[in-house]
Amino acid sequence: MQIDATIDKNLAKVTEKVTRPQRSRSYNLCVKADALRFAKLYKEAVQAYLQAIMMDRKEPQAYFGLAMSYKYLQEYKKAISTLHKLIVIDDSKDDYFFELGVCYLSNGEPEKAIEHLIKAILINRENLEAQIQLAIAHELVDEADLSLMIYNKLIETNPEFLKAYYNKAAMLMGQGDFMEASRTFFQLIKRNPDYYKAYLGIAMSFDKMSKFKDAIRYYKKFLELNQFSEDAVFARKRIEELRVEHFSRDNSLSLVKSGDGIDF
């Protein structure tokens, strides 16, 4: 019986070693660094990731975590350099190329962002955020036609992806096409009536088209959903300006006040 018990104990130890392999010091440092990064202690995370890399220069997790820490510290050149080292080790993940593209965008280099965002999309065509960032990059290098094509394709294939509507409308406003921008914002609120930024976009578009009564109406709708923000301050001020300039005798266009209720 004693022999059987000893054998059972030895088997248990072997099984534990198989199911719970010893973790390397590098791995343990990565776990610690990840915890620091998730706690937004980015400088401390950088040090832990660097230590992990010194112990194992082929650990993708350490390079990715280090790059993300640099990104949140706005040290984009260091993040870019780290991500380039990472994709030499592992070029199979769309996240790596996506983050590289985003860092290039953040560093004011949209032309370099484009190729990496395209690679991210080729690896994972479901990466909708990569497609959004690619559209932004094309807009920044004066290729608005390509941006528009990307937004339209996103809206066609992923009609619930509201960011595509919003970014497309914002780009159209920047181009001075306020009519088409307002149409796109209307498509957005059809999908989500609580998307308050769309009401502000509609109001500003009508404002620019000198459709002041409609502008006031949508500034008010925006304020119904969002009363306490810098944009709300702007909307109230603009309603008052338009009321005084164009509708001073029309009491139905009174100012929407901040507070618990909304005064029409």
PLM regions: where:
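Canonical tetratricopeptide repeat
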Residues: 31, 65-68, 72, 99, ...
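Terminal, low-structured helical/coil segments at or just beyond the last alpha-helical repeat
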Residues: 5-12, 17, 216-264
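Start-of-helix register in tetratricopeptide repeats
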Residues: 27, 61, 95, 129, ...
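Alpha-helical segment of the N-proximal tetratricopeptide repeat
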Residues: 22-55, 61, 65-74, 95, ...
